[in-house]
Amino acid sequence: MSLIEFERRVNALTQMRVADVAVPILDKDDRHHLFKVLRAQAGEEIVVTDGRGSWAFASVGDGEIVRTSDVVQDPEPYPTELFIVPLKGDKSELAVSKLVELGVTSITPLISENMQVKFKGEHREKILERWHRIALEAAGQCRRTYDITINGPVKVSDVPVDVAVAEPGTTGSLRGIRAIAIGPEGGWAPGEWSEKQLRIGLGSTVLRGETAAIVAATLLVLRGEGWAVTSYEGAVRNNGFIQ
């Protein structure tokens, strides 16, 4: 993507979801948001995407939108996953929003002994519904074209052994790691994890759960994609410097 195209994408009024990027049609809710909330005017430009990597520019018309560019297919992102224990208040929602912005591809809610949030039945469904809504909003704001996957909840005992566990005071290499588990307020319960599970530290300070999730996501995405030093016009791309 050229710098000019990138700036055009960023400066578009908004990004909206459509079923078919080639022939973009907004649903009732998105049409209301575009014309009544954002008060889009004829001729203004937006980005449309299907959440599967395809996107295009579109122009606002009289109660509709019209595609004005070729359909672009973005490359699939480097697979990264965060296992996060639901946190009190809106902390989990903040984490979900930032993980979407950072480019994490998958989030799995984690059931831990020390979790302090009701996460069963109707409570669980409401929480996951909010996560999905926030993820969609964040994707539009950051111009992300691939939806993040929000999986069903799993217990600590069911987490694959190749998932690294974030634990203060430990050290471990991120080499080959694509998934990290972040604990609840108060930390993991003694003996909650198998001795076989890799432990990694996230710095010398004790982080809040939502901060730990953001730090872990940054490390994973940095290692996988090297977006810390990225060019649009042929400059050197530095990748994989975190060992």
Regions found by a protein language model. Give the residues of each.
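Structured adenosyl-cofactor binding patch, chiefly the S-adenosyl-L-methionine
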Residues: 190-243
